[in-house]
A protein has these predicted regions:
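Flexible coil/loop and intrinsically disordered segments
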Residues: 1-175
């Protein structure tokens, strides 16, 4: 992965011959495509122009019948509207509001690292495992007051969304 502190060293290491340079550029472009396709972003359109809404979209080509059947780009949902897509969007939103600084968005590097080798990796499992690890590392058992890390609360929100919640036989949060 690229590290801004060592960017010039990385460039130097990856440009000392033509094959390395081509491979570096290919992987850089591949990471960009994977980022665009699998990482949640804010979309400012229609009714959401002011605050935006979370979206997970990929670029697809379509034939423009009007202009000589040339290919044109359009964005469509990365996944179908299934339950896993909603869970993945919700979990990524949890991580986006927990880790707001680029210096703390390590989960994005984790996703790209896993996808660059196999795009069929289970992103939901990868991110849920990451969150569980971060919650355990937060020392939440000993924390009180403002010492609780934000991930404890945002991941709990996600779990309640994912699994639902009932109290005394009454559904409070449904799946």
């Amino acid at each position: 992965m690229l590290d801004d502190k060592n960017f010039l060293k990385n460039i130097e290491l990856n440009w000392d011959n033509e094959e390395k340079a081509k491979n570096f550029l290919y992987n850089l472009l591949k990471c960009r495509v994977l980022f665009d396709k699998y990482i949640l972003k804010r979309e400012f359109i229609k009714d959401c122009k002011e605050n935006g809404k979370w979206s997970l979209q990929r670029l697809e080509a379509y034939q423009d019948e009007k202009n000589g059947k040339s290919l044109k780009p359009k964005y469509i949902g990365t996944f179908s509207g299934d339950d896993n897509n909603k869970k993945l969007r919700t979990l990524q939103a949890c991580l986006r509001i927990t880790y707001t600084s680029p210096k703390t968005m390590h989960w994005i590097s984790l996703v790209l690292k896993n996808l660059i080798y196999d795009e069929n990796n289970d992103l939901l499992k990868i991110l849920e495992d990451y969150c569980v690890k971060k919650v355990k590392e937060s020392n939440y058992e000993q924390a009180s007051g403002f010492a609780f890390e934000r991930i404890v609360f945002t991941y709990l929100d996600y779990i309640l969304y994912r699994d639902g919640y009932s109290y005394k036989g009454k559904s409070i949060i449904s799946k």
